[in-house]
Amino acid sequence: MASSILLTLITFIFLSSLSLSSPTTNTIPSSQTISPSEEKISPEIAPLLPSPAVSSTQTIPSSSTLPEPENDDVSADPDPAFAPSASPPASSLASLSSQAPGVFIYFVFAAVYCFSLRLLAVSAI
């Protein structure tokens, strides 16, 4: 029983030191936010937005017809972030690859710990 507690304590200390020593690169870079008054609004959307003087009790009239798109080519997507095959940003790939060894070591030691506890349980029977 004492060996099980000692093994648990050693494993906890080791895994804690691994997690504390690993670099924390999970920070999301802050992007510049644009307030609605600063951005340019397209003429198609402008009638749908309420003016600043409109109270919340008024409703915006809905249009029965949608404006026709200028470009008939639906497959052409002007924003690559919304493309179906868009890859994640390079910064997120770099942070994942830098954490891979620590995560692998963590799972190896967790597996060894579980196996040793199983052996202790079997030997106690």
Curated annotation (Swiss-Prot):
Which keywords does the record carry? Cell membrane, Glycoprotein, GPI-anchor, Lipoprotein, Membrane, Proteoglycan, Signal
- Its signal peptide is 1-21
Give the region (Disordered) as residue ranges. Answer: 20-95
Instruction: Name its cellular compartments.
Output: Cell membrane
Domain of life of the organism encoding this protein: Eukaryota
Q: How is it modified after translation?
A: O-glycosylated on the hydroxyproline residues.
Tell me what topology the record assigns in the membrane.
Lipid-anchor; GPI-anchor
Disulfide bond sites? none
Low complexity bias locations: 20-36, 77-95
What cellular-component terms does GO give this entry? plasma membrane; side of membrane
- Has keyword Glycoprotein? yes
User: Main site of residence?
Assistant: membrane
Is Cytoplasm there in the keyword field? no
Quote the biased-composition stretches of kind Polar residues, using this chain's numbering: 53-66
Q: Which residues form the propeptide?
A: 99-125
Lipid-linked residues (GPI-anchor amidated serine): 98
- Protein task: Proteoglycan that seems to be implicated in diverse developmental roles such as differentiation, cell-cell recognition, embryogenesis and programmed cell death.
Q: Which family does it belong to?
A: Belongs to the classical AGP family.
What name is this protein filed under?
Classical arabinogalactan protein 27
User: What species was this sequence derived from?
Assistant: Arabidopsis thaliana (Mouse-ear cress)
Q: Which gene encodes it?
A: AGP27
